[in-house]
Amino acid sequence: MAWNQPGNNGQDRDPWGSSKPGGNSEGNGNKGGRDQGPPDLDDIFRKLSKKLGGLGGGKGTGSGGGSSSQGPRPQLGGRVVTIAAAAIVIIWAASGFYTIKEAERGVVTRFGKFSHLVEPGLNWKPTFIDEVKPVNVEAVRELAASGVMLTSDENVVRVEMNVQYRVTNPEKYLYSVTSPDDSLRQATDSALRGVIGKYTMDRILTEGRTVIRSDTQRELEETIRPYDMGITLLDVNFQAARPPEEVKAAFDDAIAARENEQQYIREAEAYTNEVQPRANGQAQRILEEARAYKAQTILEAQGEVARFAKLLPEYKAAPEITRERLYIETMEKVLGNTRKVLVNDKGGNLMVLPLDQMLKGGNAPAAKSDNGASNLLRLPPASSSTTSGASNTSSTSQGDIMDQRRANAQRNDYQRQGE
């Protein structure tokens, strides 16, 4: 056996411990020769404990005052410590790698104090020294605010509003205020209450929604600006405004009335748009007719002037004949449009000729033509004490003269009988 080979200087190698001269094992009263029995288990465990203790650089002492060989044990212990330290360093370094998403920015703090920002991708930090908090800077965040608020006319209305914002500065978002979302909610509630208190309930529920939305956004921006929370307001949506249930029916009626008013206004505007072009066309047509009539009248007047200019030599040659001819032409024009003609015959009777009825009777059969003479109305002569001109025959004179009204009545009665 390897522990019982020659050349060992008379010493046998004991596999359970260090050998001693004479083949005695350390700490064991039995001999280490071939005649030895099975080793003692207690002795084996004791020696293993000494060896394990020697790995840490300690020195073991053998029983009986003898010292075993301790040369390689300190070197082996140093290697183990180095390997363990290296493993710890590797694990520490590997644990420092982390990833920031594309929509995020990393806020790095060193021993609790802000250090720097990191971009998206794979990054490294010293573990237990730096701490990284990722913040999403691209997502649109929403915050809802609602509550029962008092209006300027001392009414109560329930208002709901939605605020949309985005984080633009991660450092200020995390460390400017304790809780940025809660601070923004409180600022929104304060701004909304301030704006609602400026308007009446009637305007809030009807046409004032756009104005309230813009005023609330402006007030909210002015409120959060001193805090520099690192956020940007994107939009403020005025979602709903409801009156209390006790008066909701009355407000619904008022809203319906306003809607009807707007409907009637739109219908009136549509009617105006329809009628106005037609009226403009008629007005333009009347203007064109007036211009045409003006031009026609001017041309007729110019024609009359030219005609009289041509008649002037004839009038100078024969004044009486020319005057008579002009009189006859004028009477033809005047009597051509007259339905009744009054004729004063030589007997002093005034005849009325209803030309329209006579023209109608001319188209009737011959059997009825005998009644044409009855269409003539003879009035009694107008007596006067003195002779008057032809122009005064129809007027009242001194004496007993028939009243002109009676004469007119008789004419009307005759006209009705003739019809």
From Swiss-Prot:
It is a single-pass type II membrane protein. It is found in: Cell inner membrane. The keyword Cell inner membrane applies. Gene3D superfamilies: Band 7 domain. The chain crosses the membrane at residues 80-100. It holds the Pfam family HflK_N. InterPro entries: Band7/mec-2_domain, Band_7, Band_7/SPFH_dom_sf, HflK, Membrane_HflK_N, Stomatin_HflK_fam. Residues 383-397 have a biased composition (Low complexity). Residues 1-75, 364-419 are annotated as: Disordered. One of its GO terms (biological process) is response to heat. GO terms for cellular component: cytosol; membrane protein complex; plasma membrane protein complex. Residues 101-419 are periplasmic. Residues 1-10 have a biased composition (Polar residues). Keywords: Cell inner membrane, Cell membrane, Membrane, Signal-anchor, Transmembrane, Transmembrane helix. Residues 1-79 are cytoplasmic. Its main location: membrane. Residues 53-68 have a biased composition (Gly residues). The keyword Nucleotidyltransferase does not apply. Belongs to the band 7/mec-2 family. HflK subfamily. Integration of this protein into the membrane depends on SecA, SecY and SecD but not on SecB or FtsY. HflK is unstable in the absence of HflC. HflC and HflK help govern the stability of phage lambda cII protein, and thereby control the lysogenization frequency of phage lambda. HflKC inhibits the SecY-degrading activity of FtsH, possibly helping quality control of integral membrane proteins. HflC and HflK interact to form a complex, originally called HflA, now called HflKC. HflKC interacts with FtsH; complex formation is stimulated by ATP, and with YccA. This is Modulator of FtsH protease HflK. It comes from Escherichia coli (strain K12).
